[in-house]
Amino acid sequence: MKMVPGIQELRNLVVVRAGQSSLHNGWLAGQNERTWDLLVSYYDADAFGNDTSGMPKFFCAGGKWDGLFRTLNEAVDLSRYDYVWLPDDDLEASTQTINRIFELARLHNLAVCQPALTLDSYFSHIHTLTCAGFKLRFANYVEIMAPCLRRDTLQQLLPYVSNSKSGFGLDDVWCRLQPDNHKSAAIFDDAPVRHTRPVGLHLKSVVQQSGLSQEYEGAVLKNSFGFLDRTRPVCYAGIDSRGMMVNGPQSTGLRMALSHLKTWNKPPKNQQIRKDFFRMLRRQLIGTVDFSQIHLLPLKENDRKPASLSRQADNE
């Protein structure tokens, strides 16, 4: 397999799908030595042509996940890496933070994980916001925004995203691919990143240009997995800042709620954040977590369209 020149084989790999406004150069700033290789996979031809940084780069038009499929198949030898981080290009992070992501992933042998988001980030799920007092929280849901995947998990999923620009649906299944999924996925409060732009604006437009929707892509992808349920995020355990284990979604959720209330000083006035907060607390207190293994369907069955959305696709 051809490797893009400049990759150093550090056992950890970061691949970012990048455009004109990508923030990946900031990830290299500072004095900390990197424990990871970086490959910039450009979806924007002008950004690719204007990049004179000397960093390893690859051009591939398209969305995030179909582009990652091509990049990882054509420009990377995955057998050289234990973990691969696949962040969006609008995340602010430091070399030290990214080093810590890989350190925690390897320390806990996680199948999939993600950094928490700083409290001033744009976010989709409030449980991904950083919680003071935790090093990490074990969760049943990791976002597609910035997942870090163990090689075997990535290799298992990669063939299924060859035609998916958004990757919608991955976040519902990749925390349940192991024979034992308890504590196989986590969110790292000890390694937060800042999400600087409203969620999914560029990717949504790319998907719409193809005549589909992110929701349709998600249904198709989950249908190819033989799994159509929706995962409701719950953090069911954690490790606090003293290194002590916190067990159970109720105990974890109460600590999460107290952390946010202390940070905000009082319940938030923003109605959407207030709604998100109480939804999170309700799920933590009464929600359930399914640790059963999802078995992916053979790829030959991957062409089936979900009947419930076939008409929707025809009308878009």
What function would you assign to each model-found segment?
Residues N25-G30, T71, T97-L104:
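A short acidic, amphipathic alpha-helical/loop segment
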Residues M1-V4, L10-E33, D46-G49:
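Short, well-formed alpha-helical segments that are part of the catalytic scaffolds
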Residues P56-K57, T130-G133, L203-V206:
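Short, hinge-like loop/turn segments at secondary-structure boundaries
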Residues R80-E92:
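Short beta-strand-to-loop acidic/aromatic patch adjacent to the donor-nucleotide binding site
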Residues S94-D180:
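Conserved catalytic core of nucleotide-sugar-dependent glycosyltransferases
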Residues N25-W27, W36-D82:
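Active-site-proximal specificity loops/subdomain of glycosyltransferases
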Residues L13, S164, F168, D172-E316:
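C-terminal catalytic/acceptor-binding lobe
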